Amino acid sequence: MSYYAFEGLIPVVHPTAFVHPSAVLIGDVIVGAGVYIGPLASLRGDYGRLLVQAGANIQDGCIMHGYCDTDTIVGENGHIGHGAILHGCVIGRDALVGMNSVIMDGAVIGEESIVAAMSFVKAGFRGEKRQLLMGTPARAVRSVSDDELHWKRLNTKEYQDLVGRCHASLHETQPLRQMEGNRPRLQGTTDVAPKR
């Protein structure tokens, strides 16, 4: 793991969290229980405090950063998709930020909201509970449906279960030279399916 102290502040990682060895955590970063931090994620607590609350996930290639005297927060069961950038913002409880989205300084994403992939949320945006946000700049297009929230929660549960699976079986190895016969396929822990 790549953990760095900065001006006396050392990252705090709950023992039940999983942080991929290629992720980088610097300074004032606090990672809660059951959190998943994916490969190549960068959490730079060298300006402001970064809080990733219980059950949340920060996926591959995400960046978290912020300003002094402010907290950048991913709320409980927050779901941050691959390549997203969070800068000085607050992501509400049980919200989802889609892949490659950017959430700017002072923005607040309401709890149980979904930010569509590739969206840009402007600085100072104030979201409400259970909004579907999309576009550049992002705007609320409607409320999140019960089915969409259920789908989001199943995906978040997959990542919460992945924490234990990674602790139990993930390890560095050498590649095989050819595929073995009867190679098994991985199975999820829920019945979630891709959104169509």
Curated annotation (Swiss-Prot):
This is Carnitine operon protein CaiE. GO terms for molecular function: transferase activity. Residues 173-196 are annotated as: Disordered. InterPro entries: CaiE, Hexapep, Transf_Hexapept/Carb_Anhydrase, Trimer_LpxA-like_sf. It comes from Escherichia coli (strain SMS-3-5 / SECEC). HAMAP family: CaiE. CDD domains: LbH_paaY_like. Pathway: Amine and polyamine metabolism; carnitine metabolism. Keywords: Repeat, Transferase. Belongs to the transferase hexapeptide repeat family. PANTHER family: DYNACTIN SUBUNIT P25 (PTHR13061), GAMMA CARBONIC ANHYDRASE-LIKE 1, MITOCHONDRIAL-RELATED (PTHR13061:SF29). The gene is caiE. GO terms for biological process: carnitine metabolic process. It comes from the Bacteria. Overproduction of CaiE stimulates the activity of CaiB and CaiD.
